[in-house]
């Protein structure tokens, strides 16, 4: 199985990290979640509905749509909060990345553990910029909103391609494909990781600074 890989890059102010990352992660998971499966008998099931809600950002001129699952939202906020704190405490240039990996399990014979086979990975590279004035922050608020809108549109375009998704499992195999631990939604199995690094390029940050500078010059 070939694993699809998508890479996004964003440049944000420190207080925008959490909202930007939640917007991206929630958008991806909105398209990689189903309602809960209700099995009547093996091979016959119905799928519940997935509720959605709009989220208005406080520090970015942007509104995104997420699955209306408080459990899923708490899980994402926890890991994004850890990422934000790690960026803040890194003492470097505020460079890092988060990866959202979707996978399915392949049963192995005892005593070996199940094999996790990734089929799609989303990586978001983040560079935190330091701004000196409130005017710069206001411009950044608008520009990040515009850039984030472009990223979300790109995500939706990728999701609409007719590419591989794990086939719908039987009742006995549903835990190999979906996370059934949430009460109100059923995302494909996923895991989120992050790292703080100084190996990322500065092109995105340079572009953001130029946008702010050009706007101030108007």
Swiss-Prot record:
Listed result of changing residue 152 to D:
Abolishes interaction with ATG13
Q: Name the predominant localization.
A: cytoplasm
Classification via InterPro entries: ATG101 (IPR012445)
Outcome (variant: residue 54 to R): Impairs interaction with ATG13
- List GO molecular-function terms, semicolon-separated: identical protein binding; protein kinase binding; protein-containing complex binding
Q: Where in the cell is it found?
A: Cytoplasm; Preautophagosomal structure
Q: What Pfam families does its record include?
A: ATG101
Per the UniProt entry, the signal peptide is none
Q: Which GO terms describe its cellular component?
A: Atg1/ULK1 kinase complex; cytosol; endoplasmic reticulum membrane; phagophore assembly site
Q: Where is this region: Important for interaction with ATG13?
A: 152-156
| Single biological process term from Gene Ontology | negative regulation of cell population proliferation
Q: Which UniProt keywords apply?
A: Autophagy, Cytoplasm
Please give the subunit comment from the record.
Answer: Interacts with ATG13. Associates with a complex composed of ATG13, ULK1 and RB1CC1; the association with this complex requires the presence of ATG13.
Question: What does the sequence similarity comment in the record state about its family?
Answer: Belongs to the ATG101 family.
Q: What does this protein do?
A: Autophagy factor required for autophagosome formation. Stabilizes ATG13, protecting it from proteasomal degradation.
- The protein's name is Autophagy-related protein 101
Q: Which organism is it from?
A: Homo sapiens
């Amino acid at each position: 199985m070939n694993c699809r890989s998508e890479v996004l890059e964003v440049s944000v102010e420190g207080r925008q990290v959490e909202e930007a990352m939640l917007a991206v992660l929630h958008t991806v998971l909105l398209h990689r979640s189903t309602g809960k499966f209700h099995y009547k008998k093996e091979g016959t099931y119905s799928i519940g509905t997935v509720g959605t809600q709009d989220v208005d950002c406080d520090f970015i001129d942007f509104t995104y749509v997420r699955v209306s699952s408080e459990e899923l939202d708490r899980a994402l906020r926890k890991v994004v909060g850890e990422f934000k704190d790690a960026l803040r405490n890194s003492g470097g240039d505020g460079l890092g990345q988060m990866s959202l990996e979707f996978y399915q399990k392949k049963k192995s014979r005892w005593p070996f553990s199940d094999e996790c086979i990734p089929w799609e990975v989303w990586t978001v590279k983040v560079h935190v910029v330091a701004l000196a004035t409130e005017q710069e922050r206001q411009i950044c608020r608008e520009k990040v909103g515009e850039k984030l809108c472009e990223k979300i549109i790109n995500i939706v375009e990728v999701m609409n391609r007719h590419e591989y998704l794990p086939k719908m499992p039987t009742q006995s195999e549903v835990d190999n494909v979906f996370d059934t631990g949430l009460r109100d939604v059923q995302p494909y199995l996923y895991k989120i990781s992050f790292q703080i690094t100084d190996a990322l390029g500065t092109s995105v940050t340079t572009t953001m600074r130029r946008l702010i500078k050009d706007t101030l010059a108007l």
